Amino acid sequence: MMHCLVGSEMCIRDRLHSLVGLAAMLVGYANFLSHATEYIGIEKTIHDIETYLGILIGALTFSGSVVAYLKLSGKWGGKPLLLPARHWLNLGLLILAIYFGFAFVTEAAIGGGVEPLIFMTIIALLFGIHMVAAIGGADMPVVVSMLNSYSGWAAAALGFMLSNDLLIVIGALVGSSGAILSYIMCRAMNRNFISVIAGGFGTGTSSSGPAIEVEGAVSYTHLRAHETVHH
């Protein structure tokens, strides 16, 4: 009961978009370090993949949610942070995450692979910050919807890791509904859905063609108030 009261008070005071990502990250680490159930063979590989994905998505969602909160509350400027070669930076972070994931999954020792997991967590946190920081304030509704989808997928990965069917179902529902809503919002705002997922679509491209000149004479017609009344 005390935990519920403390959690409710935190939800009222803190206006972060979601703490699901932080919960997924912490539970993933706790489950990995507890060694409550030791898997071998293909079961260990599958469980390690589930753990890795849960922590990866959770860390990305949490750091992105913090930046989104700062932007929406006015504590972070609404102007997008456009770093040079930011798309190559995102690609590099993705490649590093895949590399550390391979190193983590192929670790033969039970409980091994802590270093790749920590490095991946740092990369995911940085990627979440960079992804949301590169988005302008006008596009934040799409970002919030996408982060909501990410939190659902993080919960689903947690459900697979913990063999919890309820978490899997709820996470899949939240993730899929958030993704569909984000797609609809992108269509309405004339945004590219893939660009939203990848991050860094902060500014739209504007037309650079010549200005249109209006030619011809302009005529004016003056009307009196009583002339506009029809009997």
Please describe what each predicted stretch is.
Residues S8-E9, V27-G41, A108:
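Transmembrane alpha-helix boundary signature
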Residues E9, R13-V20, P80-L89, V142-L147:
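Cytoplasmic-side transmembrane-helix entry/capping segments in multi-pass membrane proteins
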Residues L22, A59-L70, L125-I129, W153, ...:
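Transmembrane alpha-helical segments of multi-pass membrane transport proteins and ion-pumping complexes
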Residues L173-Y220:
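Membrane-interfacial segments at transmembrane helix termini in multi-pass membrane proteins
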Residues M1-G7, I12, H222-A225, V229-H231:
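Single conserved hydrophobic/aromatic residue that forms the stacking wall/gate
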Residues H47-A59, G171, G175:
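Alpha-helical transmembrane segments
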Residues M10-C11, W153, L167-I168, I180:
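Active-site loops and adjacent core secondary-structure elements that bind or stabilize anionic groups
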Residues S8-E9, S65-P80, F127-G137, S182:
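C-terminal ends of transmembrane helices
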